[in-house]
Regions:
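Alpha-helical membrane-targeting segments
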Residues: 1-30, 168-235, 345-373, 377, ...
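His/Asp/Glu-rich, glycine-adjacent segments
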Residues: 3, 13, 93-269, 390-393, ...
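Active-site nucleophile/metal-coordination loop of metallo-enzymes that catalyze phosphate/sulfate
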Residues: 10-39, 49-174, 185, 337-374, ...
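Active-site neighborhoods of enzymes that stabilize oxyanions during catalysis
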Residues: 119-132, 141, 145-152, 348-532
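Metal-dependent active-site segment of extracytoplasmic phospho-/sulfohydrolases and closely related
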Residues: 285-322, 431-433, 477-479, 707-730
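Active-site regions of metal-assisted phosphoester/phosphodiester hydrolases
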Residues: 545-589, 613-614, 618-805
Length: 805
């Protein structure tokens, strides 16, 4: 009854959903008939180091992410971005599996002899086309929001990305028209965005003025004001709404990137209050996206939340050394350079958003950008530098031999105070010149990374070697990171791209039970996340894997769960969703009640087999109700280990029962670490007298009576009875209720899932089993997957030798 009411209410909510209206009136194509297929929502917080996330959570700036972790819904992993630790390289590896596909955010494209900036559509398209020739994009068939690349998404599904922000792209794909329709359909959201923009503007203008009076460059301060308002608020709200529409449509993969924190952290530093201010809004946006994904009726979505890299608090060569790094290089090379009064050094030039319009002003601006990308006459005679961060690439007009490179690198470190210089010799070996001397890469580089986690050192060293061997890497590569602190070559206070401690440690939040590559236990890198995503979407298998959040303790986790025919509170029949509940909790033994087998109401599926297949578990089905040719109905037992069936039988009923439905029980024995565990799963009747008769039978000589005192026993299921009833007292007289076994534990109700008020699902255990923990997970998934909540117990048991003794 409760499920029908909730399903009815959800139906009418969908009818009046603005997301559904947007799908209909924007001419978007929903994906139908795929409700049981997986969907992946990737949410990226650009530039947020794991350390900064933990600090923000501790200060209460991200309450939703805190809730996800504290309630056990998500486990946190370190996300290592590779080298360079910048978004274009990370997303190239994430989408296409190409490591160090580009050597930096800005570098010299040796083919065209022009400076590439991985924010301009022409460069993004060029390099992404090369990646696409090597592998299929992770987002194929899906959508990409506010990223560098499309990731394989179609042009019409690529929004505010580096590859599709040109006006022509937006016009051809109909996005300009859709913006106007969007304003009409999402008018409340538009009003809210406008209000947020005005509020942020009121806060930002005084702060920008204060920055100017403190000596900051006026154009940078007001450029930051625009970034804060347009990217931190406007773009965040637009991609959030767009992402909600896309998961409502049922696209297989959706990737949304929030840029606001990264932009502000570059300006003021990654730990600044200024940058952390943006995280509260991002947290709320993630909450909205998470809710939309779990409400979607067209896909079974997983939501993975990550940051592509962190940032380091830095000092700047551009602001502390007149002439910047270009002047330092020229002095060390003893090469006089003519200063162009009309042009600042490249390392001191800002990055401007590309012009979108076709006006004459925009055309002139594009022409200036094209000219700026070309090497100057002076650069073609001496050297050029691409250094938009803590990694700088230096390209010589005239080749240098190994001796010359080494001598220059030593001068840059000793005389120019550059923390480190990498170069590749003629034998294809990479060397790292630093204050202490020189080190071969990757062999000796781990020793220079002693402050990093041990698991990361060798990986960073290998990636630095790969970076230097990129075809577009500099003849020498400057590193701003060293033992004496972090420096950047651009005018910024927060930076990333190198091997610093925090820039190499982002974060990844995934539900427990998520399958990750087996070698990603210490950290997850972009190619690992790609492999996990492709496996989850069914595109490619994981050759070997581990479960995120899996326990290592030697104990048993038991779950009992009334699955309600796998029919959720939204009216959707989904065995896959029930499997997700089990997977999230990493249960070892699972007793499921109300499982269909071959019934027309559930697509004639074998639900127990489908759930077991999704988990890779053993399964036994116990039918209790036969519907002739229309299938069977009963309960099932799933296990990580082989199942030995001892007995399957019908339980006695009461002749005068007002609902005379057949009831049965399944008794199985499972060997765990050499110990035989007896488990009986059942679903008792609805009348009080019937339940008393059935409980006496289960505890009698034909069932568990003879072994309760001598062997480990678990009796679990939906008993349709509450504590204090006669049959409960019968069970408690010989076995222990796991929810009453531990002092201080407050028993939790399991029915109904939306508003639990009854404790009718139970796990009883014999004295051989110690209850370490009993809990009822209540989250967005368990509230909707069935009309009951699952009950779990962590049980410890003595060894086989102790039992024998």
């Amino acid at each position: 009854m409760f499920a029908r009411i909730e399903s009815y209410l959800r139906f009418w909510r969908r009818r009046f959903s603005r997301n559904e209206w947007a799908i209909r009136h924007l001419g978007l194509t929903p994906v139908e008939g795929k409700s049981e297929e997986p969907g992946l929502l990737l949410i990226q917080i650009d530039g947020l180091a794991r350390r900064q996330l933990e600090a923000a959570i501790a200060k209460g700036r991200m309450p939703f992410l805190k809730k996800l972790q504290e309630r056990g819904h998500y486990s946190m992993h370190t996300f290592y971005p590779g080298q360079p630790s910048s978004t274009p390289a990370v997303q190239g590896e994430l989408y296409y599996g190409v490591r160090a596909g580009v050597p930096a955010f800005s570098f010299l494209d040796r083919e065209s002899k022009r400076i590439a900036v991985m924010f301009r559509p022409e460069w993004v398209k060029k390099f992404e086309s090369g990646f696409q020739a090597q592998a299929e994009g992770l987002l194929k068939g899906g959508s990409s929001w506010s990223n560098i690349y499309s990731g394989g998404a179609a042009p019409e599904e690529t929004h505010f990305c580096g590859s599709s922000i040109g006006f022509g792209d937006m016009w051809r794909t109909g996005k300009i028209r859709n913006i106007f329709i969007f304003v009409l359909l999402q008018f409340p959201a538009v009003v809210r965005i406008a209000g947020l923009l005005l509020l942020e503007l009121a806060i930002a203008i005084p702060q920008a003025i204060r920055g100017v009076f403190r000596g900051q460059w006026i154009m940078r301060e007001f450029g930051m004001l625009v970034s804060r308002v347009c990217i931190g608020i406007g773009l965040r709200e637009l991609v959030t709404i767009g992402g909600q529409v896309d998961v409502t449509r049922g696209l297989p993969a959706v990737h949304i990137n929030f840029l606001g924190y990264d932009e502000l952290a570059h300006r003021r530093g990654p730990g600044s209050l200024f940058a952390h201010w943006s995280l509260s809004g991002i947290d709320r946006a993630i909450k909205d996206l998470y809710g939309a994904a779990h409400r979607s009726t067209r896909r079974d979505y997983h939501v993975w939340i990550f940051s592509d890299h962190g940032q380091e608090r830095t000092r700047s060569f551009a602001t502390e050394f007149p002439g910047g790094v270009e002047k330092i290089i020229a002095d060390c090379m003893e090469t006089p350079r003519e200063k162009d009064p009309q042009r600042r050094p490249r390392s001191q030039q800002g990055v401007h958003a590309p012009a979108l319009s076709r006006s004459s002003h925009a055309e002139r601006r594009r022409a200036r950008e094209q000219a700026a990308n070309a090497l100057t006459e002076e650069e073609t005679k001496t050297f050029s530098v691409a250094a938009m961060g803590p990694v700088g690439h230096v390209y010589f007009a005239h080749p240098m031999d190994d001796t010359q490179k080494r001598a220059l690198a030593l001068r840059l470190v000793k005389q120019g105070k550059i923390p480190g210089v990498l170069f590749r010799d003629r034998s294809d070996r990479v060397w790292w010149i630093h204050e202490q001397g020189e080190t071969a890469v990757p062999d000796g580089a781990s020793a220079l990374l002693a402050g990093h986690p041990a698991s990361l050192r060798a990986e960073i060293a290998r990636d630095l070697d790969t970076l230097c061997k990129n075809e577009n890497a500099g003849d020498i590569v400057l590193l701003g990171w060293g033992n004496n602190g972090a420096w950047t070559f651009a005018a910024e206070r927060g930076a990333h791209a190198g091997p610093g401690l925090h820039e190499t440690q982002g974060f990844l939040l995934v539900p427990p039970g998520t399958r990750l590559p087996a070698d990603s236990t210490a950290f997850v890198r972009p190619s690992d996340l790609r492999a996990a995503g492709r496996a989850f979407l069914g595109h490619a298998p994981l050759e070997s894997s581990h479960h995120a959040g899996a326990r290592t303790e030697t104990h048993l986790r038991v779950m009992t769960y009334n699955a309600h025919g796998c029919s959720g509170m939204d009216g959707r029949v989904s065995p896959r969703r029930i499997a997700r509940v089990v997977q999230q909790q990493s249960a070892d033994l699972i007793a499921l009640q109300e499982i269909d087998h071959g019934r027309s109401r559930s697509r004639s599926e074998d639900q127990a087999a489908l759930i077991a297949e999704a988990l890779g578990y053993h399964v036994v089905f116990c039918p209790t109700v036969m519907h002739g040719h229309s299938g069977r109905y009963g309960h099932a037992l799933l296990s990580r280990w082989p199942i030995e069936v001892i007995k399957v039988a019908e339980l006695p009923g009461a002749p005068d029962s007002w609902w005379p439905e057949p009831r049965g029980a399944l008794w199985a024995r499972i060997e765990v670490n050499g110990v035989d565990i007896n488990i009986v799963t059942t679903h008792l009747g609805l009348s009080p007298r019937e339940r008393v008769i059935q409980m006496r039978a289960l505890l009698g000589n034909d069932w568990l009576g003879p072994i309760i005192s001598s062997e480990p026993v678990i009796l679990c299921g939906d008993f349709n009875l509450s504590p204090g009833s006669v049959p409960y007292a019968l069970a408690a007289s010989k076995l222990r209720d796991v929810q009453a076994a531990r002092e201080g534990h407050r028993p939790r109700s399991t029915f109904s899932s939306m508003h639990p008020f009854m404790r009718i699902d139970h796990i009883f255990v014999s004295s051989h089993l110690e209850t370490e923990r009993a809990f009822v997970p209540r989250n967005d998934l368990t509230r909707i997957a069935s009309d009951h909540l699952p009950l779990l117990a962590d049980l410890s048991f003595p060894s086989a030798s102790d039992l024998t003794t």
